[in-house]
Amino acid sequence: MILDYDVILARYGEVAIKGPSVRRRFEGKLLHNIKSAFSCRAELRHGRIFIFPEDMDEALDRLSKIFGIVSFSPAVTAETGFDSIEDSLREYIHELRSEGLLTSRTPFAIRCRRVGEHDFTSQEMAAFAGSVVVGEIGAPVDLGNPDLEIHLEIREDETYIYHRVIPGPGGLPAGTQGKVVALLSGGIDSPVATYLMMKRGCQVVAVHMDNAPFTGEEAEEKVEKIAAKLAEYSAGVEFKLRTFSYGRYLESCRRGAPEKMTCVLCKFGMYHLAEMVAEEEGALAIVDGSSLGQVASQTLPNILATRMGVNIPILSPLIGMDKVEIENLAKRIGTYDISVIPDGGCSAVPAHPSTASPPEAVMEASEKINVKEEVAEIFRKGSKTRIFS
C-alpha cells in the first residue's frame, strides 16, 4: 500500500530572514513560481508553504528545481487531537511497515513541532505518538540516532504527518534579483555558472556564439539541450537563449592578429557583444564560466585584458572552483551528460595560445581588426532567439 499524501509542506531559508517588505515580495514571487511549475493550490502559513497539487508525483519532481525552497515534505493530514492523530498515525506506520521502512528493529524518533494554542505540549504529543508506534510495531525509540524520524507538524485544527524531508535547491526565488546576460557554450563550465546565478534569483538571457565554420552543428544542438535543462530551474520566469553568428568575427581575428591571441580576442569580442545585448535586454551584468587558470583565456593577465572597455559588471561565479568541483555540480544539476557529448570542438583554437597577453597588445590588435565595428555588425544582424517558459 502506498502512502496517500494530500499536501506538501515546503520550507524556505534566506527568504525568511529578509526585512518585512522584502520578505513579502520574495514570498509572493516564490508562490508565483510554484504555481507556474505545476497545477496546485499554494498558500503561506506561519513560515511554511502548504501546497495542494493535482499531481503529487509531478509536484515532488518540480519542487526540487524551484529556487528559494530549502526542503519539502509530502504529508498526510489529520485533525488535531489525540484520537484523530492516533488513528492517522496507526495507518501511517502500517503503510511504512508495508513499504519496508519500519520494522520491529527500526530505531525511530518522533519529532513534534506545534504552532498555536493547544491543551498539550509538543513533548506530550511526541511521547504519545511514540507510544502508538511502540504499541503497534514494537520498534525501539532512539532520539539521538534514529534510522527513521516521523514528524508531526501541529497547527490549530490540523496536524500533518510525514517522514520524508527532501532537499530543495535553496537560494533565492527566480526573478527577484534582476536580469543578467550569461555567456553560454556547450562546455561544462558556463552552464554551471548560469545555474549559480539563477540560484541567486537572477533572470537569465543566455547568449551563445555560433562559431561556424569553426564548429559544427553538434555544438549548437548541445547548447539548445543545455538551455532546455537550465530552463527547468526557471519556473515562473522566462529563460531566453539568443544565438549570434560569430564565425565571421573569429575569421577576422585569425586574419588580422597574431594567431596566439585568437582566444583572447574571441573572449574580448564576446564581452563587448554581451554588453550590447545587456543594454537591449535591460540586464545589469554579464555572467561567464571563467575558472582561474583553467584555460588560456582565464589566466589573471588574460582576464584583465579581455575585460577592458566593458562598462558593466562581469560576474564569474566559478572563479575559485576547480574542475572536479565544477563537474560534480554539473552532474547534480543535469547538464554534465549533455556537455560531454563530443562535438568536434573549435578549430580556431591555436596550438599555442597566449596565456599572458599584455593589455596594450590586446588593445592594439582589437583596433587593427576593428573589434567594436565587427561586433556591432554582428549585433545589428540580430540573433536566433528561443524562449523557454
UniProtKB/Swiss-Prot annotation:
Its EC number is 2.8.1.4. Pfam families: ThiI, ThiI_fer, THUMP. It is found in: Cytoplasm. The keyword tRNA-binding applies. It is an enzyme of class 2 (transferase). Its main location: cytoplasm. ATP binds at residues 183-184, 267, 289, 298. Gene3D superfamilies: 3.30.2130.30, HUPs. Pathway: Cofactor biosynthesis; thiamine diphosphate biosynthesis. The keyword Oxidoreductase does not apply. It comes from the Archaea. PROSITE patterns: THUMP (PS51165). InterPro entries: Rossmann-like_a/b/a_fold, ThiI_AANH, ThiI_fer, ThiI_N, THUMP_dom, THUMP_ThiI, tRNA_STrfase, tRNA_sulfurtransferase_ThiI. GO terms for molecular function: ATP binding; CCA tRNA nucleotidyltransferase activity; tRNA binding; tRNA-uracil-4 sulfurtransferase activity. GO terms for cellular component: cytosol. It catalyses: [ThiI sulfur-carrier protein]-S-sulfanyl-L-cysteine + a uridine in tRNA + 2 reduced [2Fe-2S]-[ferredoxin] + ATP + H(+) = [ThiI sulfur-carrier protein]-L-cysteine + a 4-thiouridine in tRNA + 2 oxidized [2Fe-2S]-[ferredoxin] + AMP + diphosphate; [ThiS sulfur-carrier protein]-C-terminal Gly-Gly-AMP + S-sulfanyl-L-cysteinyl-[cysteine desulfurase] + AH2 = [ThiS sulfur-carrier protein]-C-terminal-Gly-aminoethanethioate + L-cysteinyl-[cysteine desulfurase] + A + AMP + 2 H(+). Keywords: ATP-binding, Cytoplasm, Nucleotide-binding, RNA-binding, Thiamine biosynthesis, Transferase, tRNA-binding. Residues 57-165 form the THUMP domain. CDD domains: PPase_ThiI (cd01712), THUMP_ThiI (cd11716). Belongs to the ThiI family. This is Probable tRNA sulfurtransferase. The gene is thiI.
